[in-house]
Each structure stands twice: as C-alpha cells, then as structure tokens.
C-alpha cells in the first residue's frame, strides 16, 4: 500500500530535489532573479513532472527495459514542448524571461530521475502524486530563492507579475524600499549560489535541532556468546 504521507514528506522536505538532491541547479540558479520567474519555471517543471510520471506509469509494462530511457526522454520532450507552446501563447513576457531554460526542462535530472526511480514502478495515481510533491518541493525552493534575491537586489516583490498572471497583476508589485542601483551580487548567479548555500545550511540546522529533540532510543544490550566445551 502506497504511503502518501511519506511521499509528500520526501518531496517537500526530506528528499527535496532542490535542497537535498541538488538537481536542476542550472535553471534554479540562473532564472530565480525574481519571484515571478521562479514561479513560472517552477510551475512549468511541476506540470511536466506530473504529466511525465503519469505517462511513464501507464506505458511501463509495454516498454522494453533496454529502450526505456529514450522512450522516457521522448515523453518528457513532448510534454515540455506542449508547456512551452502554452507559455508562449498565454504568457509571452515570461516566455522571453525564461528563455533557453524552458526547453532545457527536458534535460532536468529531477524529471528523468522520478520517471526511472518511481513512476516506472508504481501505479498512475501514486506516480502523479509523487510528481506533484516533487514539483511542489522544487517550486517552493525556487520561490524562496527568487523572493530573497529580488528583495536583496531590487527591494521589491512580485515585480513583473503581470508576465505570469496578466495585466491586472501589476498591482501586486510590492516596493519594500527605494533602490537607486540594483545590488548586482544578489541578482547574478554568484549571489544565487550564496543564497542557495544559506538555505541548505538552514535546512540542515533545522533537521539537526529536530533530531536532537527526538527521544533517544535505548540501544539493545549486546549479547556475548561463549563457547562451552564439555570435558570428561
């Protein structure tokens, strides 16, 4: 029986693809200059994850093991192309902002990794839930990273939200303080590396504190085996 709580825990925290597995670092560090770009890439990745997991789970019994990886990649590429065309049609500004990193979702190790490790061994519903949780965990990391970099670099939040949600979303932009010159270190990839390292360190500290608060399980006493030789 599938443990959905464990799947959610793995995707959102314990085995988070961004903070623990460190997968998809290239787009994660390059595109997250603003929270809008981070959300756009995260949602696109999550849609592809869910769709690829479902399709891989449905065809797993019909694909020979020898050619499963090329078949999985073709499925992922078809889904990425579909998502790319949808973003191009309905969120053209976001499409331009994400650039080459949108089609590069095909090569994202998170997607092919979940297809091989989970979707190819479980039913469609469980695979879809795994894709949702892994995608949501990745999107949360992207969002926190993008929000932190945008605040430090521009002093704003949700700048350019109209690219993702439409013209009405211009009113969502929050100006936290006036910035005459953007803080380039936060806006460029080196700043993303630093913020990402701090997020990983924060997660490790939280895990350590939680582990210390858990009751210690007493170790079982060791049993010493003695060999008795009967004499006489």
Swiss-Prot record:
Coiled coil start-end? none
**Matching Pfam families, A to Z?**
Rnf-Nqr
Q: Which UniProt keywords apply?
A: Cell inner membrane, Cell membrane, Electron transport, Membrane, Translocase, Transmembrane, Transmembrane helix, Transport
Q: Where in the cell is it found?
A: Cell inner membrane
Its EC number is 7.-.-.-
Subcellular location, principal: membrane
Highest taxon of the lineage:
Bacteria
Q: How does it sit in the membrane?
A: Multi-pass membrane protein
Q: Sorted alphabetically, which InterPro entries does this protein's record hold?
A: NqrDE/RnfAE (IPR003667), RnfE (IPR010968)
Q: Name one GO cellular component term.
A: plasma membrane
* The keyword Transmembrane helix is assigned to this record: yes
Transmembrane parts of this sequence: 18-38, 39-59, 69-89, 93-113, 127-147, 182-202
Q: Which GO terms describe its biological process?
A: electron transport chain
What family does the database annotate? Belongs to the NqrDE/RnfAE family.
- Cited NCBIfam families: PRK12405.1, rnfE
The annotated subunit structure for this chain is:
The complex is composed of six subunits: RnfA, RnfB, RnfC, RnfD, RnfE and RnfG.
Protein task? Part of a membrane-bound complex that couples electron transfer with translocation of ions across the membrane.
* The protein's name in its UniProt record: Ion-translocating oxidoreductase complex subunit E
Quote the gene name from the UniProt entry: rnfE
């Amino acid at each position: 029986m599938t443990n959905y709580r464990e799947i959610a825990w793995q995707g959102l925290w314990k085995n988070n693809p961004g903070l623990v597995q460190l997968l998809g670092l290239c787009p994660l560090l390059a595109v997250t200059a603003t929270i809008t770009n981070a959300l756009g890439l995260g949602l696109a990745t999550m849609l592809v994850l869910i769709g690829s997991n479902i399709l891989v789970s449905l065809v797993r019994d019909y694909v020979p093991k020898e050619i499963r990886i090329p078949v999985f990649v073709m499925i992922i590429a078809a889904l990425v192309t579909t998502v790319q065309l949808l973003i191009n049609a309905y969120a053209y500004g976001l499409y331009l902002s994400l650039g080459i990193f949108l089609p590069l979702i095909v090569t994202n190790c998170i997607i092919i990794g979940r297809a091989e490790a989970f979707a190819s061994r479980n039913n469609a519903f469980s695979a879809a839930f795994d894709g949702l949780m892994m995608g949501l965990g990745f999107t949360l990391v992207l969002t926190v990273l993008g929000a932190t970099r945008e605040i430090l670099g521009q002093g704003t939040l949700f700048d350019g939200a109209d690219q993702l949600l439409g013209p009405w979303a211009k009113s969502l932009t929050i100006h936290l303080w006036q910035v005459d010159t953007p803080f380039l270190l936060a806006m460029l990839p080196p700043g993303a590396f630093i913020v990402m390292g701090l997020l990983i360190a924060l997660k490790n500290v939280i895990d350590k504190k939680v582990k210390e608060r858990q009751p210690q399980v007493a170790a079982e006493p060791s049993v010493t085996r003695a060999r008795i030789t009967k004499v006489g």
